[in-house]
């Protein structure tokens, strides 16, 4: 598999907040392309299909019927959670499901989350 790029939606074993358990789920690659940190890892944001997680400025909702969600490979209504980030080793990424065509709303959510 080629290295995932910023904006790719990937299937990955995403660590839970307790750092003891994890769940295979989609996630969005946030890390800039060509970061060249010397480490084989990628910064990602969790994607949830739980509608109760929507409605916060740190989160971006994607309706399953939208062209955005279809391009990203998301079959369910989904929420990109920029307030739930993880750094994972590249080998933990199973596959690229698709690509989010426009990162503008996600970038705004990241700025809100990190006070940038």
Task: Please report, for each region that a protein language model flagged, where it lies by residue.
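Conserved functional hotspots at enzyme active or ligand-binding sites that engage polyanionic ligands
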Residues: 1-116
């Amino acid at each position: 598999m080629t290295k995932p790029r910023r904006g790719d939606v990937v299937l990955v074993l995403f660590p839970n907040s307790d750092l003891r358990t994890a769940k295979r789920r989609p996630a969005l690659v946030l890390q800039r392309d060509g970061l060249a940190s010397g480490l084989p890892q990628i910064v990602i944001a969790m994607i949830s299909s739980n509608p109760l997680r929507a409605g916060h400025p740190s989160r971006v909702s994607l309706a399953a019927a939208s062209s955005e969600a279809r391009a990203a490979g998301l079959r369910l209504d989904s929420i990109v959670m920029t307030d739930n980030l993880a750094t994972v080793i590249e080998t933990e990424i199973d596959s690229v499901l698709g690509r989010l065509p426009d990162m503008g709303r996600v970038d705004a959510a990241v700025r809100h989350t990190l006070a940038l």
